[in-house]
Amino acid sequence: SGHHHHDSSDEPSESSKACCDHCACTKSIPPQCRCALRLNCNHCRSCICTFSIPAQCVCTDTNDFCYEPCKSGHDDDDSG
């Protein structure tokens, strides 16, 4: 089992800018926004990752805004 899992060629360097696919904000003022699901913890001060394969990382940082989604602009539908 080789540990070569570097498929980051087709997406713009994820490490260079913070992004978030699932962001949840509270209704308080100011809002408290958390990124619900991330594949890594690049722009995250406090991060919790599961031990599953692949690991799912939850960023527990709280901001008053949401980063833009990590997914690139094109729709990719997995419906088949």
UniProtKB/Swiss-Prot annotation:
InterPro entries referenced in this protein's UniProt entry, alphabetically: Bowman-Birk_prot_inh, Prot_inh_BBI
Post-translational modification remark: Binds calcium, probably through His-3 to His-6.
Positions of the record's site feature: Reactive bond for chymotrypsin: 51-52
Quaternary organization: Occurs as a monomer, dimer or trimer. The dimer may be the active form.
Lineage of source species: Eukaryota, Viridiplantae, Streptophyta, Embryophyta, Tracheophyta
Disulphide bridges, residue numbers: 19-70, 20-35, 23-66, 25-33, 41-47, 44-59, 49-57
A cellular component term, taken from the record's GO annotations: extracellular region
UniProt name for this protein: Bowman-Birk type proteinase inhibitor
Annotated site (Reactive bond for trypsin): 27-28
Pfam families assigned: Bowman-Birk_leg (PF00228)
Record key words, sorted: Calcium, Disulfide bond, Protease inhibitor, Serine protease inhibitor
Signal peptide (residue range): none
One of the record's GO molecular function terms: serine-type endopeptidase inhibitor activity
Organism from which the protein derives: Phaseolus acutifolius
Free-text function comment from the UniProt entry: Protease inhibitor with activity against cysteine, aspartic and serine proteases. Highest activity against serine proteases, in particular trypsin and trypsin-like proteases.
pH dependence: Stable at acidic pHs. Inhibitory activity is unaffected after 1 hour at pH 3.0 and 96 degrees Celsius. Inactivated after 1 hour at pH 10.7 and 96 degrees Celsius.
